[in-house]
């Protein structure tokens, strides 16, 4: 029965991506774990495929409008792609299933992934809730002339690649400010470039799983993706009538509640 809710949630993920242009994919791992019964570590691999594929759709629209900075994307992706591939190919398989035990509590690899993901959800939610104020601050920064900040872009690229590889999320809330502050990109150009970065990061990370021999249930994964893509098509149409920017704070509060719930559930009620 929960599987039906899971496929409905996949449509909702796509719908939110279509309307808001990003953010919805942060729900992919929780949906796969709690509604579809996929293990947390495998869910991060599946999430990379779903996030990567949906971001390709989003980025292609921006690319056609000339809203992707290829130079910035290349600089950002140099450390990012290496990091995400190394994490999926080498680090994730090397982490032991049981990290440590404390009384009845068994801290496992799955628990580590879920806790890290929940913390990321809370951070991303805070960014969405404050999106309007943050955009105004970033737009103000563009009035001050600065050179292209290679160290900042390369450093954030490395951080995002590692983060994406570990939890299977895109990290757009980190990428966009870095592109505005470090590459001096206007907001629309930063959003389009961010989607291109997320698409490549996620799909290269997923290829790391494939090369590591991670078993993939392709029929299930492609079916889940199909529902998400259907949601994107519907969301893109509805975006003509619904202001996505106004929905983002509400979606942020929902994501904050979900992240807090996962933290409470896994840390307070988890016993291995």
Predicted regions and their residues:
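Interfacial segments of multi-pass membrane proteins
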Residues: 28-42, 174-189, 208
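Transmembrane alpha-helix interface/packing and boundary motifs in multi-pass membrane proteins
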Residues: 11-21, 158-167
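Membrane-embedded alpha-helical segments of transport systems
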Residues: 49-57, 78-90, 197-204
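Transmembrane alpha-helical segments that form core, pore/gating elements
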Residues: 146-183, 187
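Generic transmembrane alpha-helix signature in multi-pass membrane proteins
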Residues: 29, 58-65, 163-165, 175-180, ...
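Juxtamembrane transmembrane-helix termini in multi-pass membrane transport proteins
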Residues: 20-73
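Juxtamembrane transmembrane-helix boundary motif
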Residues: 1-13, 34, 61-160, 211-272
């Amino acid at each position: 029965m929960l599987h039906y809710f899971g496929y409905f949630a996949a449509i909702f993920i796509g719908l939110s991506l279509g309307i808001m242009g990003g953010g919805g994919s942060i729900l992919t791992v929780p949906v796969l774990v709690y509604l579809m019964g996929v293990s947390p570590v495998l869910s991060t691999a599946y999430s990379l495929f779903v996030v990567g594929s949906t971001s390709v759709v989003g980025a292609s629209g921006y690319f056609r409008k000339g809203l992707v900075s290829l130079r910035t994307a290349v600089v950002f992706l140099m450390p990012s792609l290496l990091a995400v591939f190394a994490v999926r190919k080498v680090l994730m398989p090397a982490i032991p299933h049981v990290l440590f035990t404390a009384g009845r509590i068994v801290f496992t690899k799955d628990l580590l992934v879920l806790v890290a993901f929940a913390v990321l959800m809370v951070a991303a939610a805070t960014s969405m809730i404050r999106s309007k104020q943050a955009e105004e601050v970033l737009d103000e920064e563009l009035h001050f002339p600065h050179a292209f900040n290679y160290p900042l872009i390369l450093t954030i690229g490395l951080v995002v690649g590692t983060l994406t590889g570990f939890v299977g999320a895109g990290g757009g809330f980190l990428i966009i400010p870095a592109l505005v502050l470090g590459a001096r990109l206007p907001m629309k150009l930063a959003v389009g470039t961010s989607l291109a970065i997320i698409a490549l990061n996620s799909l290269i990370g997923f290829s790391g799983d494939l090369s590591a021999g991670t078993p993939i249930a392709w029929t299930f994964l492609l079916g889940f993706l199909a529902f998400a893509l259907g949601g994107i098509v519907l969301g893109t149409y509805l975006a003509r009538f619904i202001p996505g920017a106004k929905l983002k704070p509400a979606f942020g509060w929902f994501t904050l509640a979900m992240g807090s719930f996962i933290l409470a559930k896994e840390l307070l009620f988890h016993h291995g």
